[in-house]
Structures are given as C-alpha cells and as structure tokens.
Amino acid sequence: MLLSSAAALLLPSTSFDQPQKGWEPLLDKNLSKWRTYESYRHQNGYKGQQPVDAEGKPLTPIGYDKNEANVFSVVMEQGQPVLRISGEIYGCVFTKQDFKNYDLKLKVRWGKKKWTPRLNEPLDSGILYNSQGECGVDYWRSWMLAQEFQVSEYRDGNAMGDFWCIANSSADIHATHNTTENTLKFTPAAPLLTMGKEGRNFCQASANYESPNGEWTELELLNVNGQSVHLVNGHVVLAAENSGYLANGQRNPLTHGKIQLQSEAAEVFYKDIMIKPLAAMPAAYSKYFK
C-alpha cells in the first residue's frame, strides 16, 4: 500500500520532515537500520515470467529477512563497517525508515563475483529511492516501486548514475537520443521527456566518472520534493523531476519512501552511507530544473 503525502507527515523524524543538523550514518555492523528481501536465483532465459520448479510448479520467493546464503553481510575494514552484497540471489537491503527531502552519500566498490544470469553482463547494482509498497512488483520480482540511481560498471551503454523506472514509476528528464547506443541520454539543454511511458524507462548518465576498478566511487543523491540529482565523484550526471508513479492511467506523486540497495547478480561493497535533511534543493542545482 502506498503512503500518502499526509501520511508522510506522521512518519518518524528520520523522514526529515523535521530538519535535523548533521549527517546520520545508516550503516552499522548489525545492519540495525535495514531489512532484507530475496526473491529468486534467476536463471538464463528469464523474461519476467513466474519462476517454476522442475515440475513446472510456481516457486515461492524466499521473502523478507531470511538472508539465505548470507547475501547481505557487514565486514569490517580499518575498523569501519562495509556492507557486502554477494549478488547470488536477486533482492535488496532496504531502510526500515521512510525518508523525504534529503542528501544521501555513500561509496561503492566492485567485488570479484558474478552470477547467472549476468555472467556476461556489466557488474550491476543500484540505489532505489522513493521506494514504496511491497518488494517483488518489478520485472525481476525483487524490488519495490521506486526510482533508480543505477550503480553499474561503465560498459555496454551502462554507467554510474543512469536512471531506471522501477515497476510503474515515472519521472521527467531532459534527454536526447543517443544514436550510437540507441537510447536516451541526460542532456541539460534538451527538452523534458517523460519516463515510464511509451517504452521509455531508461536514461543514460551524461558521462562516466566512475573510479578505476578496485577503488571506491563516491555517489550522492539529492532528493527534494520530486526533484532528484545524481552525482558521481562530485559530478552531476543526471537530474530528474516530477517523480511519480502511474496507476489507472493517472500519474501520482512519488516523493518519499525507503531506500533500497540492489542485489543483482554481482558482488558489490558499500560504505560511508550517510543521510541528512534538506529543506530545499540547493541553489547550485536549480539550473537543472528550469
């Protein structure tokens, strides 16, 4: 069930309707601020269909808070907690709290392992924001309705900071058609295009600013009143506005929610996950929303 804007006003203080000073760390060694969801070990040939067993009977998703195969764990590096997502099973780790109007920072580094069905695909994960409802409503039957700040190695038209609609989400992005890769690309001076309709559900980041393999890449998400900015190592790579979701032919606001980190067939590490409230989108980024 989606939360209304009125309901958001009643959320705990970590929804940031009440301004707070400083940054709040979201990661500790016990994952005390997070829950987990696992769906399936997806196989080659998956095209959105219900997974079945050897007898053709529908498989039940693993579900919430099972953490089968220890997909989600915390390791300590130099005395600091680091979240490891093995990628073996599709799913997510998501915040217990609902957040609205914030600046989120975190660092990401790739591991070595890859899993079916993405053995020959780019390493992939993602930050899903404004996440509402139950997990499992998307194409991969693994995540909540949300907007995606893609976390991907730079390869085959994918990059850190790309945008995906998850499930029936929608947003407007200034974009042009990238003829080289036959997709949309964030271009601040271009007209606004609505994502989530007419087959448009993906937009490339404007450029690649990922750190060399094996090094940490700093990601930042500014998310205020339906506007969002994706930054990679301090560079703006995408901006989206009018965040919403489509239901019964109508577009509805999608401006707050939980934060999900994806398990998507690749080993990945996250650290220094911090969040702080924003009363408004910082003026330095207003030029992206004219």
Residue ranges and their predicted role:
Residues 1-3:
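Bacterial N-terminal signal peptides that target proteins for export
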Residues 16-290:
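Carbohydrate-interacting regions of secretory-pathway proteins
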